[in-house]
């Protein structure tokens, strides 16, 4: 389109609900009316990261392997995006390309290999009040925010950590561990795309 090769990988939440059926109509789907030549991913706002509702174009398909064999949606779409980019480079080296990469992370469901969540074991046991204070101070130290910035008040809908039921705290801490692992996992795979662009010296394009 306009001289570009185009592809979308991952989540497509732009299709109206009444057009998401696998029977069509497909005029709002990425590769039929959404402006992309190639699409690999899922339609909607969320999907199971181990058993996603996958489509290639408008064709439903099963994941290439099972979770027991190491399947995860983020890794899959990254593999597909890297392969597509390399194919474009090999076949049409002079033609620019556009990749829209939209992983399911960190939208629910928060599903990520255990080794990524275990890296954060115990990191959130102090609770969200202490964590937000530490994060805020670190952002100031790194000049991410101005030195004069003030920490906003905790939303009234969220209880103080000290007031949370002690039996619930381990569950909430584990949820934060999983979220952090999920976020680092997707960051790692985005890094794989960046590595390819750095290899080709096109990251600044």
Annotate each predicted stretch with a short phrase.
Residues 1-205:
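Formylglycine-dependent sulfatase
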């Amino acid at each position: 389109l306009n001289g570009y090769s185009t592809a979308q990988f991952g989540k497509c939440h732009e299709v109206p609900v009444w057009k998401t059926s696998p029977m069509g109509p497909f005029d709002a789907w990425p590769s039929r009316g959404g402006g992309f030549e190639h699409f690999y991913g899922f339609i909607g706002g969320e999907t199971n990261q181990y058993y996603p509702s996958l489509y290639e174009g408008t064709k439903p398909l099963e994941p290439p392997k099972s979770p027991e064999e190491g399947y995860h949606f983020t890794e899959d779409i990254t593999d597909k995006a890297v392969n597509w980019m390399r194919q474009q480079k090999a076949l049409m080296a002079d033609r620019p390309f556009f990749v829209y990469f939209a992983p399911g992370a960190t939208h629910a469901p928060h599903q990520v290999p255990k080794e990524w969540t275990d890296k954060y074991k115990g990191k959130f046991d102090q609770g969200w009040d202490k964590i937000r204070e530490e994060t805020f101070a670190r952002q100031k130290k790194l000049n991410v925010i101005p030195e004069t910035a003030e920490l906003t008040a905790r939303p009234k809908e969220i209880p103080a950590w000290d007031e949370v039921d002690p039996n619930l705290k381990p569950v909430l801490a584990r949820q934060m561990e999983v979220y952090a692992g999920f976020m680092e996992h997707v960051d790692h795979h985005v890094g794989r795309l960046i590595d390819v662009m750095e290899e080709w010296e096109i990251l600044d394009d």
